[in-house]
Amino acid sequence: MENKIDACLHLALCQEHLGHTEKAVEALLKSFLYDSPRGEACCELGRMKMKEEKYREAAYWYTQALSSRPAEQTGAFVRKDCYGFLPSIQLCVCYDRLGDHRRAWHYHLKSQKLKPEHPSVRQNQTYFEHKLKHPAEGQPSAL
């Protein structure tokens, strides 16, 4: 089962590289036939939707990634960031682009707890401090 899921993920990357976006999406969705959705597949779907600037759809897939659990006990190749940090930081971007700054801030704080020194987290902190004019600690005053 895990080999089939992993094959779907690799096939999706190959299809996307060849410019076959729909086939890439199909390969990712096919992985759901073998077991519950993996964070890796959900993050890839979210990334593809962000690339198309479909931020609401991207947010859906990143939210699914956050609610999924890694299949570590099955011997699967697990990218741990796909179950916490990556969906959180990408949800911050999605909600900011959708104009929902309160949710964007929420996911920024979540990503900040996971990797406070990550360059993207630090950049987002500076962005929010400038954009929303809030103190470095606590919630932005504009929210």
Region spans (language model):
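Residues that mark the junctions of alpha-helical repeat units in TPR/alpha-solenoid scaffolds
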Residues: 4, 11, 38, 77-80, ...
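TPR-repeat structural position
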Residues: 21, 55-56, 101
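Conserved structural position within tetratricopeptide repeats
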Residues: 29-33, 64-67, 112-113
